[in-house]
C-alpha cells in the first residue's frame, strides 16, 4: 500500500503574541504596554496574532486554544532587582506564572495554561518574557522608569524568538499608520505623560 505524500509544505504554526496585565496598577501594565509597542514597531506574517489580553483572565483560554505557539509579555515577581527582564521557556513557564502579584478579581495566567492543557490545547512552544515590577500599588500610576526601560529589550527578545520559529518580522516604516489593538486603546505616551503635570505641581 502506498501512502500518498501530502501536497505542499505543512501549514505554518499559529502563533499568539500576548500582553497581559492591568495598566491602571503601575508596573502591572508592563505586558500590555510591551505588546502595544511591539505591535507599533513590527509587521508580521498572517499566521501571527498580536493580542492585548489585559485582565481577561480565563477568557484568554479561547485564544490560547486557537494557537500552536505562544509568546507572553507580563510583569512577574521573580524576586529580582526591579526592572530585571527574565525569559522563561516551555516547561519552565508554569512554575513562574503563578508568582505574579495580581488584583483579587483577576485570574492568574497559570490557570489559563492549566485550562488549555485540560482541554488538550497546551501550546507546543511557549516563551514568557517577564519583567520584575517595582510598584504594583500605585492606582492610576504609570510604569516606573526601571520597568519602562525594559520594553525595548523585551520587544527585541520577541523578535528573536519569532525569527527562530521561522516568522518573517518586518519593521514598520517610520510614520506608518498603525491600527490600534483595541477599539478604545489608551495611548501609552499620553497616559504616561499625564502624571508629569501633577508631579510638577507637588
From Swiss-Prot:
Alphabetized UniProt keyword annotations: Aspartyl protease, Hydrolase, Metal-binding, Nickel, Protease
BP-aspect Gene Ontology terms: protein processing
Gene3D superfamilies: HybD-like
Pfam families cross-referenced by the UniProt entry: HycI
Domain of life: Bacteria
GO MF annotation terms: aspartic-type endopeptidase activity; enzyme activator activity; metal ion binding
Binding site for Ni(2+): 28, 74, 105
Similarity-based family: Belongs to the peptidase A31 family.
Known role: Not known. Could be involved in the processing of hydrogenase.
Protein name as catalogued: Hydrogenase expression/formation protein HupD
Species of the source: Rhizobium leguminosarum bv. viciae
Gene: hupD
